[in-house]
């Protein structure tokens, strides 16, 4: 496990080199999955830490949820400000230092903008609100790389707005239900391509550059990774599939620290992060 399935394995040195390759503009990576329980927030945090560790860019993880999102349990939170606080102060955000007042930051340099834990109607993130946040955080190179953790409970206009903003998507899949949910996610993109012909190339591009992460959240799995990877590549048309082995340090929704993971998991997360950057370089 912990490998690039069906493809030539690259040494860590080459993966790191690929991960560091330049990007021409600010980019958005959306972690999306139709179902819950696939370790999406965990992988969002882990990939973000890998990217922040190896790149000099400003990297931020955003909790895109209608209520309490998962990233605030996976990354350190030192700031009471939330995405709604940022929205209320958009007029004052002109540069990175302004945005930084609303984020938390871990030792890798990865920043976090949380969704907060309020379920009040006026605290619910809307599609329009999300679009304004992305617009402000990508303006003037405020942040170079934005990782958006799309909560499984996000549907409708907000989810479509997240997909619209994405340059690349990462789709975690754990077990049979996760694989089915990943296929549903891809089918949603095809539906949007048919519904909005003027945006069809964008939605089809998200499929062709997508990275699927077969996430092993238990010590044993009944899935055959190579068979699943072949299905995603040949029938669905994604660009890459990476297997992430089970790691006890990443279970139970605990805080993520990539320095604590085992070697196989560390290599898999490095692989996953490198594949994300490779997909970004093809899409922008």
Language model regions located:
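Walker A (P-loop) phosphate-binding motif
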Residues: 19-51
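Extreme N-terminal, non-catalytic leader segments
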Residues: 1-31
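Phosphate-binding loop that captures ATP/GTP phosphates
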Residues: 54-111
């Amino acid at each position: 496990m912990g490998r690039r399935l069906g493809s030539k394995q690259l040494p860590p040195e080459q993966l790191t080199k690929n991960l560091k390759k330049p990007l021409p503009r600010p980019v958005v990576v959306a972690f999306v999955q139709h179902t819950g329980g696939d370790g999406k927030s965990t992988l969002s945090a882990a990939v973000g830490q890998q990217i922040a560790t190896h790149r000099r860019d400003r990297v931020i993880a955003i909790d895109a949820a209608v209520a309490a999102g998962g990233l605030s349990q996976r990354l350190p939170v030192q700031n009471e400000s939330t995405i709604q606080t940022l929205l209320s102060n958009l007029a004052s955000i002109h540069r990175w230092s302004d945005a930084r007042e609303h984020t938390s930051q871990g030792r890798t340099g990865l920043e976090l903008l949380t969704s907060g834990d309020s379920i009040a109607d006026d605290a619910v993130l809307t599609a329009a609100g999300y679009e304004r946040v992305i617009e402000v955080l990508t303006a003037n190179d405020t942040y170079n790389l934005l990782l958006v953790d799309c909560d499984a409970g996000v549907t409708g206009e907000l989810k479509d707005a997240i997909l619209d903003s994405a340059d690349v998507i990462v789709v975690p899949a754990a077990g049979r239900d996760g694989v089915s949910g990943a296929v549903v996610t891809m089918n949603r993109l095809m539906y949007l391509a048919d519904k909005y012909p003027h945006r069809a190339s964008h939605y089809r591009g998200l499929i062709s550059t997508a990275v699927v992460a077969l996430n092993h959240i238990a010590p044993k799995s009944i899935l055959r990774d190579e068979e699943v990877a072949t299905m995603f590549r040949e029938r669905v048309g994604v660009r890459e599939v990476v297997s992430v082995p089970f790691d006890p340090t990443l279970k139970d929704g605990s805080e993520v620290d990539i320095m604590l993971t085992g070697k196989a998991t560390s290599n898999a997360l490095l692989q996953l992060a490198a594949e994300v950057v490779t997909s970004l370089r093809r899409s922008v």
